[in-house]
Amino acid sequence: MFKFNDEKGQLKCSFCGKTQTQVRKLVAGPGVYICDECIELCTEIVQEELAKDEEVEFKDVPKPIEIREILDEYVIGQDNAKKALAVAVYNHYKRINSNSKIDDVELAKSNIALIGPTGSGKTLLAQTLARILNVPFAIADATSLTEAGYVGEDVENILLKLIQAADYDVEKAEKGIIYIDEIDKVARKSENPSITRDVSGEGVQQALLKILEGTVASVPPQGGRKHPHQEFIQIDTTNILFICGGAFDGIEPIIKRRLGEKVIGFGSEKKNAEVNEKHVLSHVLPEDLLRFGLIPEFIGRLPVIANLEPLDEDALVDILTKPKNALVKQFQKLLELDDVELEFEEGALIEIAKKAIERKTGARGLRSIIEGLMLDVMFELPSRKDIEKCILTRETVANNAPPKLVLQDGTVLDTKTSA
């Protein structure tokens, strides 16, 4: 029988045998002792077992309006894209719940194409959807993919990322979401099929066809290239939702040409082109994607096309302040942990938005701009106990002037004089 104490009379954990001096806590029960380390280990084991037993249920998928409302909390603007995504996602998981058949009518899968400029929110929309639905989510970069037989990443490695996101629970992964970014970069270089092989373009599209439509794929557990005598993970992609996003730079002239507008013109025609410039992507059709360089079979696997508009100054200011995880709120929280209040003046927010537009980075570039502005302040403040408030002004952003620092006695300093 296990002894509860050693020769020196110290109490021991009944499970691991460590003495009370070797652990932080020893909990006593009827005729038994357990240490904090064993409690933590047991908790992890139970949680893992419970997670395995949980079946992936999608009976409570939010309605499209509810999905849209949650997206509004994290993503500013892009109303048309949100509506299209909400409907497509709801129908996708409704299709899964119906076991793909209703009265012998087979419901086809509706993968999604997201078209919009860099930093307009494509990746964030896909990530937020996965969070809403509580499903595994993986991001892949189309530019790293090549067709089988060439140096590069096999398309099956996309599926491995999803399996890893599901903690290697294949059944759970089979109902996840995969976002393939930069899909426009695998467009073939010409509308006409090339005689020579296009390793980075059409070949990748061909390789993606099967997994987009639905197939049982063999995935190497460790990633990399397949080789003989290797064990594979079998995963059915029929119920995986694929969202393919890209900026599709250069598609606007194709759309305008189809709409009968001249790409280069004078007078009223030029004025019309300028008026419609912001909304030209809202007119995109599958035939435009074909002319851009996607093959017909690939376009057919993406029946839902949602476009995102370029973000203007007002939208970028809203992105800085309104979402639940807005950047301004994040930086305010960071300084709050050092007992300092952070304030962004309205003029500063407008200048930050202008810089992002100038750099053509959209919302993606906002964080790097603020990080640059806050570097000196965040370096100095943790060592200062007399600072109560930090104010970023328009001059701070536009002319690299130091932020205002307010001392606890009300004195206003700048970073140059506060050292």
UniProtKB/Swiss-Prot annotation:
* CDD domains linked: RecA-like_ClpX (cd19497)
Which keywords appear in this protein's UniProt record, sorted alphabetically? ATP-binding, Chaperone, Metal-binding, Nucleotide-binding, Zinc
Q: Which PROSITE patterns match?
A: CLPX_ZB (PS51902)
| Residues binding ATP | P117, T118, G119, S120, G121, K122, T123, L124
For this chain, one GO molecular function annotation is: ATP hydrolysis activity
Q: Spell out where the chain crosses the membrane.
A: none
The organism's superkingdom is given as: Bacteria
Q: Does the keyword Transcription apply?
A: no
Any single Gene Ontology cellular-component annotation: HslUV protease complex
Its assembly, as annotated, is: Component of the ClpX-ClpP complex. Forms a hexameric ring that, in the presence of ATP, binds to fourteen ClpP subunits assembled into a disk-like structure with a central cavity, resembling the structure of eukaryotic proteasomes.
For this chain, the family text in UniProt reads: Belongs to the ClpX chaperone family.
Q: What does this gene product do?
A: ATP-dependent specificity component of the Clp protease. It directs the protease to specific substrates. Can perform chaperone functions in the absence of ClpP.
What is the protein name given in its UniProt record? Answer: ATP-dependent Clp protease ATP-binding subunit ClpX
